[in-house]
């Protein structure tokens, strides 16, 4: 008779969860930040709000973003004027867009990840899908399963409405699934489309305007599994430790509410200050067991909520400017893509590390950290170990 303990032992993987492939995708429509204020105020019939436009221009100039990608083209916005008005009932129009576009963009990223992985998609055992862009039943996980032609008995997990910290959440969940299920191969997809948050400007709600200056569309996909098959699967990063915490005294710092007018976005407190005040504690908890206290000796992937967050974290920890280079490069090229951002940065880092002839996927260093920040204020921490190139 086999004991429960023996069954349990047989079910578990031997080694740590590893990221085996990464794919990314963006809509075709590229938006230049320098000219975006003109477009935005014109398409929303707000050109008479001269002072507000100047304010928005300054927000865009300070954003450290050069370009973003958006599903919402001029044509789509002209066909859906309710989306352009500030707080006009428009949820139906927005939902009609995102229930199609979110899985479609997710599929684009997933196809690239599966190709890099090099294994048949029939070997995918689990699917995690994450989006803050709309809700539906059955969800985007189901739609993606159909679009990719995955097996009907893939174990799916759908995460809706998590916000900007969720790139860390999906890694934490994928790690637990991979390590507790021998042979598991987890497809992780984050897909974000700003059609839910786009709206015209308001004199009285400048936090909404901040979102209009920062958010972009993108999807990222990973394959995660333990015990890579030698000669076939090539690990990129190992996931060693994860944590999630709610920052003290931060309630209401970042809020999003799904309303008739779409997803509303609110910044109510000093978000960069809250993040920088709590980052030290998160790092000590993560790296004390490894005897690491010099945070310039690790590689960095931080959700780029905006440039002020990165500036304050750098200042607080006395980080060298190059530590946040991959993070800032992704912010500059794509804007804030919510949950997908940190996965884009992982991709950027491993590619640049190889191009620059460095010895590991983590900028030549062994250990690194990935941070997600978002509503709550919630902080996700993932300790990563790089792989030799």
From Swiss-Prot:
The cross-references to SUPFAM superfamilies, in alphabetical order and at most eight, read: Thiolase-like (SSF53901)
Q: Name one Pfam family in it.
A: Chal_sti_synt_C
Decide whether keyword Acyltransferase is in the record. Answer: yes
Its annotated pathway?
Secondary metabolite biosynthesis; flavonoid biosynthesis
Q: Which residues form the active site?
A: 164
Q: Per the record, what are the reactions this protein catalyses?
A: (E)-4-coumaroyl-CoA + 3 malonyl-CoA + 3 H(+) = 2',4,4',6'-tetrahydroxychalcone + 3 CO2 + 4 CoA
Q: Does the keyword Transferase apply?
A: yes
PROSITE patterns, alphabetized: CHALCONE_SYNTH
Job of this protein: The primary product of this enzyme is 4,2',4',6'-tetrahydroxychalcone (also termed naringenin-chalcone or chalcone) which can under specific conditions spontaneously isomerize into naringenin.
Q: What protein name does the entry list?
A: Chalcone synthase 5
Q: Which species is the source of this protein?
A: Trifolium subterraneum
């Amino acid at each position: 008779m086999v004991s429960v303990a023996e069954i349990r032992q047989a079910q578990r993987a031997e080694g740590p969860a590893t990221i085996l492939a990464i794919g990314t995708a963006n809509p075709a429509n590229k938006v230049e930040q320098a000219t975006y204020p003109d477009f935005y105020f014109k398409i929303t019939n707000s050109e008479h709000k001269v002072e507000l436009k100047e304010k928005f221009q300054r927000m865009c100039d300070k954003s450290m973003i050069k370009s973003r990608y958006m599903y919402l083209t001029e044509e789509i916005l002209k066909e859906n004027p309710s989306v352009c008005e500030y707080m006009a009932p428009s949820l139906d129009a927005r939902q009609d867009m995102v229930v199609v576009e979110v899985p479609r963009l997710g599929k684009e990223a997933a196809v690239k990840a599966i190709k890099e992985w090099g294994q048949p998609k029939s070997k995918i055992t689990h699917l995690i899908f994450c989006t803050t862009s709309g809700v539906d039943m059955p969800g985007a996980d189901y739609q993606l399963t159909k679009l990719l032609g995955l097996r009907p008995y893939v174990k799916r997990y759908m995460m809706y409405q998590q916000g900007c910290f969720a790139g860390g959440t999906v890694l934490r969940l994928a790690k637990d699934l991979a390590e507790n299920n021998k042979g598991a191969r987890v497809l992780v997809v984050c897909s974000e489309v700003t059609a839910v948050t786009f709206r015209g400007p308001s004199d009285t709600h400048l936090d909404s305007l901040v979102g209009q200056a920062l958010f972009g569309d993108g999807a990222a996909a990973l394959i995660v599994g333990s015990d890579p098959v030698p000669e076939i699967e090539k690990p990129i990063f190992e996931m060693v430790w994860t944590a999630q915490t709610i920052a003290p005294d931060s309630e209401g710092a970042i809020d999003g509410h799904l309303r008739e007018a779409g997803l509303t976005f609110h910044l109510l407190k000093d978000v960069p200050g809250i993040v920088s005040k709590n980052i030290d504690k998160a790092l000590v908890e993560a790296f004390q067991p490894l005897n690491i206290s010099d945070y310039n000796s690790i590689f960095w992937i931080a959700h780029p909520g905006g440039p002020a967050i990165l500036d304050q974290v750098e200042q607080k920890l006395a980080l060298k400017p190059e530590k946040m280079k991959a993070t800032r490069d992704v912010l500059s090229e794509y804007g804030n893509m919510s949950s997908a951002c940190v996965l884009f940065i992982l991709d950027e880092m491993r590619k640049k590390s190889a191009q620059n002839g460095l010895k590991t996927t983590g900028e030549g260093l062994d250990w690194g950290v990935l941070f997600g920040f978002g509503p709550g204020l919630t902080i996700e921490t993932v300790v990563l170990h790089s792989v030799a190139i």
